[in-house]
Amino acid sequence: MAAKKVDVLLIGGGIMSATLGVWLRELEPTWSMQMLERLDGVALESSNGWNNAGTGHSALAELNYTPEDDNGNIKITQAVNINESFQISRQFWAWQVRNGVLKNPRSFINHTPHMSFVWGDENVAYLEKRYQALKASPLFAGMEFSTDPEQIKKWVPLMMEGRDPSQKLGATWSPLGTDMEFGEITRQFVSHLQSDQNFDLQVNSEVSDIQRNADGSWRVTYTNTKTDAEQVVDAKFVFIGAGGGALHLLQMSGVPEADDYAGFPVGGSFLINENPDVTMQHLAKAYGKASVGSPPMSVPHLDTRVLGGKRVILFGPFATFSTKFLKEGSYFDLVSSVTTSNAWPMVRVGIDEYPLVEYLAGQLMMSDDDRFAALKEYFPNAKQGEWRLWQAGQRVQIIKRDEEKGGVLRLGTEVVAAKDGSIAGLLGASPGASTAAPIMLSVLEKVFKDKVATPEWQAKLRQIVPSYGTKLNDDPEKVREEWAYTAEHLQLPTPPQIDLEALKGAGAAPAGAPVKKVPDIAL
């Protein structure tokens, strides 16, 4: 069988592969590319709008990104890093809108304030400390903090009506928040790529073999899931952006770099309300804090979503468990991913992360009434008949071999690449799609290191991402410029003013003490 030859093969038709394809189309327009997707179309797994929470993750509201150390100091480093990454995404999308790659911004990004919403003396004190700590960064300008029920009611009336007036509450509100439809971005990116004769999309195409050729390229065999016809493609560079399917494919390639990894699948479900009388009264993504005694997985949040042009409200997530690595995967995914090199790390994580096991067991035992009771903590006047339970996508958390501990559960995403850069894959879950542009930029820096260093690529990278190579957190004026530029092209509200005097007053955070390790799973 004669193999088709391409410069780049993208395995998986989600936001990651589509984003990398668009990056490469900008940087090397003559390169030939093929994309393989096992389902009937692109963006049908985790990138699909109904299969994720659609948060434009920029650490404005997610409390697990600002842990408290043993001395009571709030650590904002991770929050700043995640926000920096999201600013790269904003610039990347703004450039694509300018160039007609992405169409109407309202179809994929919508202004949705991000809030943290907590109750109880200890949690309110923590939230105020967090608010004060974030004043040291220009990236969090415009954030407001309040313990006044009347003010909080102006922000989120649904969350306040019917609430016990004696309950001690605290909330922060940021005008910089967004709701994202990553499925729409994916579809528009792939549509743009398809307009070029150097790009070929094959759907219903499942990879069955990945072998190294003598010349260093990769021979990938795939089967049409409708006809069973087998085809072969030779690629100089292979990117595995297959979500939960990426670990299997990396293992299939035989690259030793994959030996360090195992995966643990966790799903998430949400309660959904589509009644316009309710959905039009809530405009926020309001994140809570994990209850005492349970590890902060993805903490509960009550979210405005815009899906297919329609406003809906989601509440969750509730953890679910399946041995599948993909929503449309196989129940044998987990067991078939176990190898002699990753079995022990998985056992160690199971022992060390026992609170996770307890948490998942508790989540799986929840009844409809239990889930509704959790919702009422955030939306006291909710009516049970208006909500339905929806199973969202699967996430596969990274378990990585560790010399000291045997194995550790890793947060975030990791790029796993062969030493020669000829094949790379993306493992992990959070913050995921929000940071697809910077994550794929890190893939370019890892596997095309020499090209990234050329004046041609450097100039193009800075054209697409004007802040490339700089830390926005250290340059308030650049933050102001970037916000104004991206807000204009993404049709977002005028960004808040940055108070330079407040930044000076905040000063540097204390050195601090160790931060207690908390198990965390991204749903």
UniProtKB/Swiss-Prot annotation:
Single GO MF annotation: L-malate dehydrogenase (quinone) activity
Pathway participation: Carbohydrate metabolism; tricarboxylic acid cycle; oxaloacetate from (S)-malate (quinone route): step 1/1
Pfam families in the cross-refs: Mqo
Keyword Disulfide bond on entry: no
Catalytic activity: (S)-malate + a quinone = a quinol + oxaloacetate
EC number: 1.1.5.4
Entry superkingdom: Bacteria
Enzyme class at the top of the EC tree: oxidoreductase
Keyword Oxidoreductase applies: yes
Cofactor: FAD
Record key words, sorted: FAD, Flavoprotein, Oxidoreductase, Tricarboxylic acid cycle
Alphabetized InterPro entries for the sequence: FAD/NAD-bd_sf (IPR036188), MQO (IPR006231)
GO process terms (BP): tricarboxylic acid cycle
Family: Belongs to the MQO family.
NCBIfam families per UniProt: mal_quin_oxido, PRK05257.1-1, PRK05257.1-4, PRK05257.2-1, PRK05257.2-5, PRK05257.3-2, PRK13339.1
Name of the protein in its database record: Probable malate:quinone oxidoreductase
